[in-house]
Amino acid sequence: MRCPYCGNEDTQVKDSRPTEDNTAIRRRRFCTACGGRFTTFERVQLRELTIIKTNGRRVPFDRDKLMRSVQIAMRKRPVEQERIERMVSGIVRRLESMGESEIPSAMIGKLVMEGLSSLDAVAYVRFASVYRNFREAKDFEEFLGELSGPLGSSLRDEDEDR
């Protein structure tokens, strides 16, 4: 494994252990050239996935990009990182087990919306605002009006707490 600090290819694994949800192996590594320490994760990849963007362009699936998108929606929300990681791992497993190698980006957005709806109502609305391309305040109002059940009531409860 190449050192991210100096580019040296001679690194040593100092510690390996499974992640808490057993979906990856976490490895602590040490660079023999610069002494840098870094962590890598090894995950099972069932198949190569290609995402079909709304403009028709095809790009390789990037789990890290999915995680970044979810973390942006979850920023400053009281949700443990482990729960976010489990949600993202679940989405990836669902995508890989669909049997398709090409997946529309809208499908990923739908799966993220499903996951966020049970994780955090505010993050759900944040993600929806980007996913559904909200342009004006009325777009938020219409979306919030569509919400019903526990998610809608939890958003209203948070609003009343302020």
From Swiss-Prot:
Function of the protein: Negatively regulates transcription of bacterial ribonucleotide reductase nrd genes and operons by binding to NrdR-boxes.
InterPro entries reported for this sequence: ATP-cone_dom, NrdR-like_N, RNR_NrdR-like
Keyword ATP-binding: yes
Originating species: Parvibaculum lavamentivorans (strain DS-1 / DSM 13023 / NCIMB 13966)
Pfam name, any one: ATP-cone
Keywords: ATP-binding, DNA-binding, Metal-binding, Nucleotide-binding, Repressor, Transcription, Transcription regulation, Zinc, Zinc-finger
Xref: PROSITE patterns: ATP_CONE (PS51161)
GO biological process, one term: negative regulation of DNA-templated transcription
Gene Ontology molecular function: any one: ATP binding
Cofactor(s) the protein requires to work: Zn(2+)
Region of interest called Disordered, as start-end residue ranges on this chain: 1-21
Protein name: Transcriptional repressor NrdR
Gene label: nrdR
Zinc finger (unnamed): 3-34
Cofactor note: Binds 1 zinc ion.
Domain of life assignment: Bacteria
Ranges for domain ATP-cone: 49-139
Family: Belongs to the NrdR family.
Biased composition (Basic and acidic residues): 11-21
Keyword flag Hydrolase: no
Coiled coil: none
